[in-house]
């Protein structure tokens, strides 16, 4: 038996460190030097992804990675549809951190809030989306997959060859997710492109419009979702902007949670959360408009009378219901047939299939992550049938739902198209998972330079001895002041946890409680015209912002005084186990504190 060699404590420590690094997937062995809680969250960079075998994708960050020991018993890979984004270099992250500490924030003018789609996507450039290459039934599955991978690598190579990483926004690098889009477009008779009304230009890729209306010859319906989060005049202005530039579009306004007329319109009530009214999904605004758009497209080729009858029943039920709670609405109504299409994206089915087959119209719902695709389906059905989450990438694969025997809905996973948007704006749009952001401070600075965050949250400058004195603010100061106000401290040193505070501010922005709305070109000059537009008045009445309150249950507002509730929301988002709604602003109904978090009613010392 060989003699045992001495093994020092230092060697043992190094062995354990190497073992932990291997488990975390760190190839370079770098570890964060920070001893704070924020440093522990930022310490990992994702493993280099070379699964596609090309140098174009050698700096890919894989988000929502699930622990897996290989394929499951049925050959299912839980990480097959995870988000793939280009990874920021460590030098770039450190540079942005320094800028967040040093750069003084200056408010921008209203003209800088105007977004032109030609500046974001540059139609006609290489900022396109990957198309499924030509194929034939004589090809095997392996040949088809190999051809698609080569085509996808060429697509990525053209984009990265034309633009530097600093100019490009985050966009999807996972071929499996693009295959889901191909399948949805091939099986759909009508395509719904869902966008967020706060920044619809961000969610509207012109290349998809040209492909759907031109090459496929399908009707495209643009859904401006979450209209309760924007002023009615701005909603009408965006509607006319898209009608003017894309005449083949059918534009529909939608929200799953119409604003209650008794909800105060005070922008300073950021920390107020409204209790959700009962039968919330049946109150969705927009199903009637969507039905009229589909009737104009199908022109009698499909019998949609059952859909109209369903909408009438939902409206009658919402009027009759006494708001007894969400449990009641989950049980009401007929069952909805759900089909999970986990591997259908790999099937070689062409887009030339029969339209309105068997008298059924298939409506495909596509769009960016976190724009409310799943919430829209719940609003159309009238109750919760689709799991929704604030975390982008929650929908892993497309599913089909029969709204009525003649109407089939198809929910596609969210996809990020390549553009030239600032990455900070993408974070504020909810495209990137907030819990996995390496450097959230510049996004906070981007937000604070466009809306008065300090005034809305009543923040006190961390270096101010006199509260009435004026001090210059930087993004780091705002995060530190919010951490002090909320009591966010690091675990060991009890310093202000600025990383957690920055994440909290970004969640408020994504949820709509810190609402940042962008405008179409020329809106600032014509704001008065849009405010007096007849469609604006009609939308105000439709949303229920004016008029009698009605015989509904009273709503209560409770202030977010406990940090435990917000921490619970953060954990649910990070683990992707939360099934909260994608829209939870002040104006939207929200469930009670006790219902959302059993620890929210405890005092600060009991958490």
UniProtKB/Swiss-Prot annotation:
Biased composition (Basic residues): 1-14
Molecular-function GO terms, alphabetical: GTP binding; GTPase activity; structural molecule activity
Cellular compartments per GO CC: extracellular space; nucleus
Pfam families recorded: MMR_HSR1 (PF01926)
Superkingdom of origin: Eukaryota
InterPro entries per UniProt: G_CP_dom, GNL1-like, GTP-bd, P-loop_NTPase
SUPFAM superfamilies xrefs: P-loop containing nucleoside triphosphate hydrolases
Residue ranges, annotated region (Disordered): 1-81, 547-607
Residue positions where Phosphothreonine is found in the record: 48, 50
Alphabetical GO biological process terms: DNA damage response; signal transduction; T cell mediated immunity
Compositionally biased region (Acidic residues): 550-584
Positions where Phosphoserine occurs in the chain: 32-34, 51, 68, 324, 561-563
Residues annotated as binding GTP: 225-228, 367-374, 411-415
Domain annotation CP-type G: ranges: 178-418
Keywords: GTP-binding, Nucleotide-binding, Phosphoprotein
Function: Possible regulatory or functional link with the histocompatibility cluster.
Record-stated family: Belongs to the TRAFAC class YlqF/YawG GTPase family.
Domain notes: In contrast to other GTP-binding proteins, this family is characterized by a circular permutation of the GTPase motifs described by a G4-G1-G3 pattern.
Protein name from the UniProt record: Guanine nucleotide-binding protein-like 1
């Amino acid at each position: 038996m060989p003699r045992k060699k001495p093994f020092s404590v230092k060697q043992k420590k190094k062995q354990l460190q190497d073992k932990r690094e291997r488990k975390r997937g760190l190839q370079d062995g770098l570890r964060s030097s920070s001893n704070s809680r924020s440093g522990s969250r930022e310490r990992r960079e994702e493993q280099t992804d070379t699964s596609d075998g090309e140098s174009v994708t050698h700096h890919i960050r894989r988000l929502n990675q699930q622990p897996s020991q290989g394929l499951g018993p049925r050959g299912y890979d839980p990480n097959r549809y995870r988000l793939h984004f280009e990874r920021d270099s460590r030098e770039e992250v450190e540079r942005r951190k320094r800028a967040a500490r040093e750069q003084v924030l200056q408010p921008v003018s209203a003209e800088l809030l105007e977004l032109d789609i030609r500046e974001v996507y540059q139609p006609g450039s290489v900022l396109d989306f990957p198309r499924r290459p030509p194929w034939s039934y004589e090809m095997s599955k392996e040949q088809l997959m190999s051809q698609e991978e080569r085509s996808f690598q060429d697509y990525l190579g053209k984009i990265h060859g034309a633009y530097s990483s600093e100019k490009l926004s985050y966009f999807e690098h996972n071929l499996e997710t693009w295959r889901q889009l191909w399948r949805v477009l091939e099986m759909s008779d009508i395509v719904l492109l869902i966008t967020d009304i706060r920044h619809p230009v961000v969610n509207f890729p012109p290349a998809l419009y040209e492909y759907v209306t031109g090459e496929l010859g399908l009707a495209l319906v643009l859904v401006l979702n979450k209209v309760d989060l924007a002023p009615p005049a701005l909603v009408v202005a965006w509607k006319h902007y898209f009608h003017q530039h894309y005449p083949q579009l059918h534009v529909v306004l939608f929200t799953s949670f119409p604003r209650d007329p008794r909800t105060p319109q005070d922008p300073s009530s950021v920390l107020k959360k409204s209790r959700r009214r009962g039968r919330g999904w049946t109150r969705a605004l927009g199903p009637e408009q969507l039905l009229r758009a589909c009737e104009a497209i199908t022109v009698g080729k499909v019998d949609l009378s059952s859909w109209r009858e369903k909408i009438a029943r939902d409206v009658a039920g919402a009027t009759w219901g006494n708001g007894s709670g969400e449990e009641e609405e989950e049980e009401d109504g007929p069952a909805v047939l759900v089909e999970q299409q986990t591997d259908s994206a790999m099937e070689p089915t062409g887009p030339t299939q029969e339209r309105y087959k068997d008298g059924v119209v298939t409506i495909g719902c596509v769009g960016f992550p976190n724009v409310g695709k799943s919430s829209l389906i719940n609003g159309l059905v009238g109750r919760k049938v689709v799991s929704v989450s604030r975390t982008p990438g929650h929908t892993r694969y497309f599913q089909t739902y029969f709204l009525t025997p003649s109407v089939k809905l198809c929910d596609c996973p969210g996809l990020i198209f390549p553009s030239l948007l600032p990455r900070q704006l993408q974070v504020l749009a909810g495209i990137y998972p907030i819990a996995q952001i390496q450097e959230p401070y510049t996004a906070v600075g981007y937000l604070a330079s466009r809306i008065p965050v300090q005034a809305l949250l009543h923040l006190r400058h961390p270096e101010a001895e006199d509260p009435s004195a004026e001090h210059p603010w930087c993004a780091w100061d705002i995060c530190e002041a919010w951490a002090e106000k909320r009591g966010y401290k690091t675990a060991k040193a009890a310093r202000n946890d600025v990383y957690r505070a920055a994440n909290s501010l970004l969640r408020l922005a994504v949820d709509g409680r810190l609402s940042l709305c962008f405008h179409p070109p020329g809106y600032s000059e014509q704001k008065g015209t849009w405010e007096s537009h007849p469609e604006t008045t009609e939308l105000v009445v439709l949303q229920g912002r004016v008029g009698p309150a009605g015989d509904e249950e009273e709503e209560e507002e409770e202030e977010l005084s406990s940090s435990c509730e917000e921490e619970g929301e953060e954990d649910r988002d990070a683990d992707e186990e939360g099934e909260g709604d994608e829209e939870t602003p002040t104006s939207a109904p929200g469930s009670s504190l006790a219902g959302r978090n059993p620890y929210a009613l405890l005092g600060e010392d009991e958490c």
